[in-house]
Amino acid sequence: MEFFISMSETIKYNDDDHKTLFLKTLNEQRLEGEFCDIAIVVEDVKFRAHRCVLAACSTYFKKLFKKLEVDSSSVIEIDFLRSDIFEEVLNYMYTAKISVKKEDVNLMMSSGQILGIRFLDKLCSQKRDVSSPDESNGQSKSKYCLKLNRPIGDAADAQDDDVEEIGDQDDSPSDDTVEGTPPSQEDGKSPTTTLRVQEAILKELGSEEVRKVNCYGQEVESMETPESKDLGSQTPQALTFNDGMSEVKDEQTPGWTTAASDMKFEYLLYGHHREQIACQACGKTFSDEGRLRKHEKLHTADRPFVCEMCTKGFTTQAHLKEHLKIHTGYKPYSCEVCGKSFIRAPDLKKHERVHSNERPFACHMCDKAFKHKSHLKDHERRHRGEKPFVCGSCTKAFAKASDLKRHENNMHSERKQVTPSAIQSETEQLQAAAMAAEAEQQLETIACS
């Protein structure tokens, strides 16, 4: 406990433990579900949290809560993160600590950029303490951790301050490689070293696949660890990041100036640059392979409930019952304006927008709005430059499934490929078959007589 006495005898006390206890208490309340006023659903996993904490840590949630009217019963579904990644992000918000698997470092950085969490977004410019395995028994631990402490003050100064190197200068890692083998303790120095996360640190991960990561306007190469790379341990390894509980100055961080990145943030908030993976069966796109595999099971799953009228199969009895309405012609939902009837209530709701001209699905990268969510998704793909629908004949890609279908009908359909000679040949074959049938009929008539 420290205290200061000014000339006016005003005593000020600083409780150094308050911030730690404050976060600890908040986290305990979250884990017990106490005073939680928001639920976040990620991949069917529900996370309870406090809106004030989410908004304080993430500019994404801050903007989202301002745009949406939410209360204690509100549930927000996020479809651009894995549940395990979001769980670690949430733990970071409440504990200032985060553990990341090496193969997920790039994904965590991308998540930090999307959610507007500066510490996670700046992992590529942070400094990490490399903790080596314990070799006291001649064997390494099952894991070693890279411990990252958040730099304090200006970002430029943070890159040069508090860098402690282990070993002689000649033994330090080069700009091209960083050895994962722990340093020897015979020199009497600590087995922990702090390194700048620049290109050398990123190359420590090794790579067969290199992709670009945007770090406040500068592109660096980020690489994923190949399985054959030996970094000092044959067992799975993890990265542990600790965010110091330092006072955050009210200054604009490079790359997040309000004027320059407002549109960029809107793009990240509602239509970020994640690469989309398309289902080969129906063309629906997903942000990660896990969701795609889950969706593909819908195409390959058993469909024991078969419609007797059209033989179409369904996975559940409820889906079959809903389908049967098509054959019965039963349309219980009628439009009050024009009287048109529909089988399903959602279809009626879509139709009513024709009369009201309501466009509830707005693009947050421009001012355009749409009546249907599917139209908005097609529009957002154009912003992101995504073309997940690929023609199987010529490999040309399209942003909309309808564009692909139109292309296939116009360029690769059978009627387009039929040449005049083929038509003539087919006509001659039909004529020959007709003449043969007529001759055969005449022979049968003669035989009967």
Curated annotation (Swiss-Prot):
Output compositional bias ranges, type Basic and acidic residues. 405-417
Q: Which UniProt keywords apply?
A: DNA-binding, Isopeptide bond, Metal-binding, Nucleus, Repeat, Repressor, Transcription, Transcription regulation, Ubl conjugation, Zinc, Zinc-finger
Q: In which tissues is it expressed?
A: Ubiquitous.
- Cell compartment(s), UniProt: Nucleus
Q: Identify the stretch(es) annotated as Disordered.
A: 156-194, 405-424
Question: Which part of the chain is the BTB domain?
Answer: 36-102
List the CDD domains.
BTB_POZ_ZBTB14
GO BP annotations listed: cardiac septum development; coronary vasculature development; heart valve development; kidney development; negative regulation of DNA-templated transcription; negative regulation of transcription by RNA polymerase II
A single GO CC term for this protein reads:
nucleoplasm
Q: Where are the zinc fingers (C2H2-type)?
A: 277-304, 305-332, 333-360, 361-388, 389-417
Stretches with biased composition (Acidic residues) = 157-178
Q: Which domain of life is it from?
A: Eukaryota
Q: Where is this motif: Nuclear localization signal?
A: 50-66
Q: Where is this cross-link: Glycyl lysine isopeptide (Lys-Gly) (interchain with G-Cter in SUMO2)?
A: 46, 203, 249
Matches recorded under InterPro entries: BTB/POZ_dom, SKP1/BTB/POZ_sf, Znf_C2H2_sf, Znf_C2H2_type, ZnFinger_BTB_dom_contain
Example GO molecular function: DNA-binding transcription factor activity
Task: Name the family the entry cites.
Answer: Belongs to the krueppel C2H2-type zinc-finger protein family.
Query: What quaternary arrangement does the UniProt entry report?
Result: Interacts with ZBTB21.
Described by its record, this protein's role is as follows: Transcriptional activator of the dopamine transporter (DAT), binding it's promoter at the consensus sequence 5'-CCTGCACAGTTCACGGA-3'. Binds to 5'-d(GCC)(n)-3' trinucleotide repeats in promoter regions and acts as a repressor of the FMR1 gene. Transcriptional repressor of MYC and thymidine kinase promoters.
- Read off the domain note: The BTB/POZ domain seems to direct the protein to discrete regions in the nucleus.
Protein name as annotated:
Zinc finger and BTB domain-containing protein 14
Its source organism is Mus musculus (Mouse)
